[in-house]
């Protein structure tokens, strides 16, 4: 996105991006109680059928290299895996009430706290710390997490994912229509963005904004251009 925003085809009509993170659960059967967690190493060795099989998968997926591409120098394999319901709810709530710029700041912070520092994503105190670091009122964030708000919307989004045949991540839905599956390189996404940019009309819409109840005024908010953040 930064590449396209930094070098627009038409400087008088630069592209802007609105990002909506759609909740997806790698472990939907995980207990949502905050006391539950296990190390990611244990989770993946179980998933792939043992240490040797996990090592082979790790090598073939080039996770280290892909992580470095998005600013994660080294994945903490012993990070705490837990239910991600609370973190998904928090990101959706911030998107609805503050817009995608603040939501992306919290999302990126949570990625570092989890993948690098090893924190678990159902820790309400940690989640509120991340929200506060982005300027969100900490007490307000905690009150939200202690409520049941946002659960119905996340359930609706899960139904949409099933209907669209999306059963893994990462997946990118661009403009509500173009689906790009897998950990593609940034160059592939740039091609898609440039193709949309060349029309001069922008993307047609969002596939999930209605299901996630994103208000129109928040859908209109965009990420700042590089250098303007």
PLM regions: where:
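C-terminal cap of thioredoxin/glutaredoxin-like
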Residues: 1-10, 21-22, 92-229
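Structural alpha/beta surface segment adjacent to cysteine/selenocysteine redox centers
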Residues: 2-114
């Amino acid at each position: 996105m930064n590449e396209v925003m930094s070098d627009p085809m038409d400087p008088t009509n630069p592209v802007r991006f609105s990002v909506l993170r759609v909740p997806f659960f790698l472990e939907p059967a995980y207990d949502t109680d905050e006391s539950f967690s296990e190390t990611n190493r244990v989770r993946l060795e179980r998933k792939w059928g043992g240490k040797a099989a996990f090592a082979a998968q790790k090598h073939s997926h080039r996770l280290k290299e892909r992580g470095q591409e998005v600013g994660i120098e080294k994945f903490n394999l012993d990070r705490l895996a837990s239910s991600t319901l609370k973190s998904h709810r928090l990101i959706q709530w911030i998107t609805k009430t503050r817009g995608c710029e603040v939501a992306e700041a919290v999302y990126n912070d949570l990625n570092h706290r989890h993948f690098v520092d090893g924190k678990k994503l159902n820790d309400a105190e940690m989640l509120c710390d991340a929200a506060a670091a982005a300027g969100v009122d900490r007490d307000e964030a905690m009150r939200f997490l202690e409520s049941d708000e946002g659960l119905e919307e996340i359930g609706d989004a899960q139904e949409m994912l099933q209907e669209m045949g999306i059963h893994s991540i990462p997946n990118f839905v661009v403009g509500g229509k173009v689906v790009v599956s897998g950990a593609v390189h940034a160059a592939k996404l740039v091609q898609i963005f440039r193709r949309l940019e060349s029309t001069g009309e922008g993307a047609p819409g969002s596939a999930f904004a209605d299901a996630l109840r994103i208000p129109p005024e928040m859908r209109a908010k965009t990420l700042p251009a590089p250098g303007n953040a």
